[in-house]
């Protein structure tokens, strides 16, 4: 059950990848049909307008996801994917192409902001990184399938048919995912819990083999809603900077200039045949998908920070080499040799990019924010990604035509150098931590006391944490520990009643119970200092015996 749900959810990544990958080869044929060059503003606009749509989609996804849930948000994205793909495949002119690209862009933005959050909320800490990377694997796999299928259509069909079929076929995965929504994909248990649906949340969590006691954080607010103001709080600012900064670095690495414009890059680098640049985009997409698959096994083994550092510094070296070679192509380096060098260097670049800066930003985005702010924060970080993406994608082909390959990649190298500095000083390690531990880590960094207090050894599910100063939540934990109550999760509003049910029948027994809790936390100096206060609070909270 769990594997099928993960695969169905990750289909959104495939749609994201297919629709971003298909435009590379399709545009290379479409430009001849509609009569514009690969360095024209029309060429750049067709790419960039979808990214602008994705920026808007990422913004509105937060409102849909918070108000109606993750599943309806994914359903909206599927509907837009179908409409945009079919409309673009049948487009009679450039204007209709642009409209359909906006629709597809909205779908990409909604999907890219929602699915990493959904996957993070239904996965245990041990497998959370690999699960979110699975979405990236489907994304890069979609780019690979798009490159291969579009190349076949371009080579073996007429100029007005190949690109239309390749784009229109992108509606099929959206239909499949919409079908999966009806029969396989449940709502996020965290979202359900935040809306007060404790029983439904438990039912979903049982199917995923996830301990609902970890999800007590969701009870803090009566609902999850979009509000960007809390993101400016003292313990949230660094998280916003980190998640948004990593998304911007991902785009400034030049990855989507390669995925959108590899045909143009290889053509300018020496592959002057009209078909060869399109065909050679296939091995590049394959390298991206292959090394994203590697990340599934490395992200939870070697950690987020280490993978990021290796990735960004390796990419910087490759970009500098590409820029140097770009200056000498056509002069000291022949086009035949330069084209081969470019192909090899771009392949190595993707091998370094994919398991690090390619997927880790999405993992971190899904991990570092509390439940009630996760949709807002994911919206901001994803908008940062698409904002940087639209800038790079709009400017890149124009720069290629104005200052050539060497000058363009020199600028990208400079941006990547800034990214290396950012990662070195800002990236943190979240490998193996529960969402509560991650929250405490960022609060400590901000000079604030932890929100969750560890009362013993916490398992992978994060049980054993309570929110400091909250007797109601302490009672909720007791309910989670009692098998006789079905491991139920109670909401904050019912916490006092729950405490009464699990407490001992007299004041002295209640006092003894809390003494035992304090003793079990004796390793915490703060707990020792506050034992008397906790004890007295427990006595006051207990029901009095009738006289």
From Swiss-Prot:
**Where is this protein chiefly located?**
membrane
Q: Which domain of life is it from?
A: Eukaryota
Keywords, A to Z, come to: Membrane, Sugar transport, Transmembrane, Transmembrane helix, Transport
Its GO CC terms?
Answer: membrane
Under the heading SUPFAM superfamilies, the entry gives: MFS general substrate transporter
For bias kind Polar residues, which ranges apply? 519-529
The record places the following residue ranges in the Cytoplasmic compartment, namely: 1-2, 65-78, 123-136, 186-245, 298-308, 361-385, 429-547
What ranges does the record give for the region Disordered, renumbered to this chain? Answer: 449-468, 510-547
Among InterPro entries, the record links this protein to:
MFS_dom (IPR020846), MFS_sugar_transport-like (IPR005828), MFS_trans_sf (IPR036259), Myo-inositol_Transporter (IPR050814), Sugar/inositol_transpt (IPR003663), Sugar_transporter_CS (IPR005829)
Picking any one GO molecular function of the record gives: transmembrane transporter activity
Q: Family membership, please give it.
A: Belongs to the major facilitator superfamily. Sugar transporter (TC 2.A.1.1) family.
Please identify the protein, giving its name as recorded: Membrane transporter D1
Q: Which species?
A: Leishmania donovani
At the highest ranks, the source species' classification is: Eukaryota, Discoba, Euglenozoa, Kinetoplastea, Metakinetoplastina
């Amino acid at each position: 059950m769990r594997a099928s749900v993960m695969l169905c959810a990750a289909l959104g990544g495939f749609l994201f990848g297919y629709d971003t990958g298909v435009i590379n080869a399709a545009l290379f044929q479409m430009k001849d049909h509609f009569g514009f060059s690969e360095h024209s503003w029309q060429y750049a606009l067709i790419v960039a307008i979808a990214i602008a749509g994705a920026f808007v989609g990422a913004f509105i996804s937060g409102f849909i996801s918070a108000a109606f849930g993750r599943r309806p948000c994914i359903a909206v994205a599927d509907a837009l994917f179908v409409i945009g793909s079919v409309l673009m495949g049948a487009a009679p002119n450039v204007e209709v192409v642009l409209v359909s690209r906006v629709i597809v862009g909205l779908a990409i933005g909604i999907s890219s902001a929602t699915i990493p959050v959904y996957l993070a909320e239904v996965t245990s800490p041990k497998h959370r990184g690999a699960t979110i990377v699975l979405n990236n694997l489907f994304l890069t796999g979609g780019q690979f399938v798009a490159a291969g299928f579009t190349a076949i259509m371009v080579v073996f069909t007429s100029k007005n048919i190949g690109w239309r079929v390749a784009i229109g076929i992108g509606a099929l995965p959206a239909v499949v995912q919409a079908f999966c929504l009806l029969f396989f994909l449940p709502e996020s248990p965290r979202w359900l819990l935040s809306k007060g649906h404790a029983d439904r949340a438990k039912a979903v969590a049982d199917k995923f083999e996830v301990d609902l006691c970890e999800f007590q954080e969701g009870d803090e607010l009566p609902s999850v809603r979009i509000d960007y103001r809390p993101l400016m709080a003292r313990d949230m600012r660094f998280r916003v900077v980190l998640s948004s900064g990593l998304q911007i670095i991902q785009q400034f690495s030049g990855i989507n200039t390669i995925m959108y414009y590899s045909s143009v890059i290889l053509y300018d680098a020496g592959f002057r045949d009209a078909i060869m640049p399109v065909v050679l985009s296939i091995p590049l997409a394959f390298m991206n998908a292959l090394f994203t698959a590697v990340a599934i096994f490395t992200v939870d083994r070697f950690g987020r920070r280490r993978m990021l550092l290796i990735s960004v510094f390796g990419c910087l070296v490759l970009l500098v080499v590409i820029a140097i070679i770009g200056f000498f192509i056509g002069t000291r380096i022949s086009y035949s040799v330069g084209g081969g060098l470019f192909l090899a260097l771009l392949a190595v670049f993707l091998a370094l990019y994919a398991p690090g800066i390619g997927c880790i930003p999405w993992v971190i985005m899904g991990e570092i924010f509390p439940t009630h702010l996760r949709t807002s924060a994911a919206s901001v970080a994803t908008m940062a990604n698409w904002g940087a993406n639209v800038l790079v994608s709009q400017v890149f082909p124009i720069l290629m035509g104005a200052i050539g390959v060497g000058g363009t990649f020199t600028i990208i190298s400079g941006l990547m150098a800034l990214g290396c500095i950012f990662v070195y000083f800002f990236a943190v390690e979240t490998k193996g931590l529960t969402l509560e531990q991650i929250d405490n880590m960022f609060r400590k960094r901000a000079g604030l006391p932890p929100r969750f207090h560890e009362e013993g050894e916490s398992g992978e599910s994060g049980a054993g944490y309570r929110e400091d100063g909250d007797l109601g939540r302490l009672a909720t934990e007791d309910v989670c520990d009692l098998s006789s109550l079905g491991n139920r999760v109670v909401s904050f509003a019912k916490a006092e009643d729950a405490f009464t049910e699990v407490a001992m029948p007299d004041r002295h027994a209640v006092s003894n119970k809390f003494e035992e809790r304090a003793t079990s936390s004796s390793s915490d100096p703060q707990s020792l200092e506050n034992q008397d206060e906790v004890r007295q609070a427990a006595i006051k909270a207990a029901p009095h015996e009738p006289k």
